[in-house]
Design a protein with these regions (language model features):
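Catalytic core of Fe(II)/2-oxoglutarate
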Residues: 171-247
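Short acidic (Asp/Glu) patches
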Residues: 91-95, 106, 111-121
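Aromatic (phenylalanine/tyrosine) cluster motif
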Residues: 8-9
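Catalytic core of non-heme Fe(II) oxygenases with the double-stranded beta-helix
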Residues: 112-190, 224
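Short helix-to-loop capping/linker segments positioned immediately adjacent to catalytic or ligand/cofactor-binding
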Residues: 72-73, 95-99, 118-122, 179-180, ...
């Protein structure tokens, strides 16, 4: 629980505000060698090939729906994957997980390339538990399109819909009534967040710049050994495929 500030009326403290049930989005900066960075960008452009966007008009090119979702199996990206996986482990510990009681798996890893005026619509990742994005471009200005994280609930607006604005009584972007949080990309910036959170990417507003990032989806299961708790999926090594009954 975070105590934000006390309320005052005529100079007398009347109450204390408690921010409850926080949602944690973590950020950190990774150091990427400039030569490695240039090589990664060249590789990702080659993987994109002649396709400059997804089938939906105005949408950025995303590797997960274009057959490029296993960057974690490419040797070139192994150092980056290792660094991001370390940070993902740190995220779990930061929000109270006992790492000895869970196993963390990297499920998907794909690039997102956004040319001018391309965006990624609001979505979440229902097949993952923890997601991360590592930016390979950006100067922190947000001109190339910010990552927007959408609030799952708006309890403090009290009257449903008021926080949307349109001349309503709630102050715009008040910290206790915000419906979104924006993060501007910059080289080496890593962001981690619960996969269930809705998020989007605003349009790239710089006609001279390519916005490039790598996305990671992690899944949490029980450890390989021992009895798994009923609320946590057993380790994949304990799974068995069912026979194909379609033929």
């Amino acid at each position: 629980m975070l105590v934000l500030w006390a309320g005052f009326f005529n100079g007398v403290m009347t109450f204390t505000l408690h921010q409850l049930f926080p949602t944690v989005v973590a950020t950190t900066k990774l150091v990427i060698d400039p030569l490695d960075l240039a090589g990664h960008l060249q590789t990702l452009l080659a993987l994109r090939g002649g396709t400059v966007g997804n089938p939906s008009e105005g949408c950025a090119w995303t590797g997960d729906i274009n057959g490029v979702w296993q960057l974690h199996h490419q040797a070139e990206f192994a150092p980056l994957v290792h660094k991001v996986s370390e940070q993902a482990t740190g995220y779990l510990e930061s929000v109270g997980f006992d790492r000895s009681q869970v196993a963390l798996h990297l499920q998907r890893c794909w690039p997102v390339l956004s040319d001018w005026d391309q965006l990624v619509g609001r979505h979440h990742h229902p097949n993952a538990h923890l997601s991360a994005v590592l930016y390979l471009t950006g100067d922190g200005s947000g001109e190339e399109g910010v990552l927007r994280v959408h609030a799952p609930h708006q309890s403090n607006e009290l009257v449903p819909g008021l926080v949307a604005g349109h001349g309503g009584p709630i102050s715009s972007d008040h910290p206790l009534n915000s419906e979104r949080w924006d993060l501007a990309p910059e080289v080496g910036l890593l962001v981690l967040f619960p996969s269930r959170l809705d998020h989007s990417v605003l349009a790239n507003g710089d006609p001279e710049s390519l916005r490039c990032s790598i996305s990671f989806d992690f899944v949490i299961t029980a450890p390989e050994h021992g009895n798994p708790p009923e609320y946590l999926a057993p380790h994949p090594s304990q799974w068995s495929p069912c026979p194909d009954l379609s033929s």
